[in-house]
């Protein structure tokens, strides 16, 4: 959808939440890493919820974006060490959630809450959460790149 601004109005907005959901689902569900000791694999299996607001606007001829999103993701830790017995039949060592209560356009410090990882919480936080943050920090640039061309002066 192209948003026209024939009289150069002060603000032009475009709702980008549907695109954001597709983008974040695509980028995040492909994330996985093998632990530094090589004994386990951590992977994001599902983005279970994305809510909030995401918009690209034009003000005085310049594209800007603003978003305030809440995300919930399912993550599992699986065993790669064939000598270990703490797993269930599928090799799953832990199955938990990562929650992001506020992912905002003006914050680079993203709070991430974890639950359900028990003994593997430290591993998930130290070796997987940085990959999630790295992916999320690319979102704003990609959002503007994708949608600023749709807002015309």
Swiss-Prot record:
Disulfide bonds: none annotated. GO terms for biological process: protein folding. The keyword Isomerase does not apply. InterPro entries: Aha1, AHSA1-like_N. Pfam families: Aha1_N. GO terms for molecular function: ATPase activator activity; protein-folding chaperone binding. GO terms for cellular component: cytoplasm; cytosol; nucleus. SMART domains: Aha1_N (SM01000). It is found in: Cytoplasm; Nucleus. Co-chaperone that binds to the molecular chaperone HSP82 and stimulates its ATPase activity. Although not essential, it confers thermotolerance when intracellular levels of HSP82 are limiting. Monomer. Interacts with HSP82. Belongs to the AHA1 family. This is Hsp90 co-chaperone HCH1. It comes from Saccharomyces cerevisiae (strain ATCC 204508 / S288c) (Baker's yeast). The gene is HCH1.
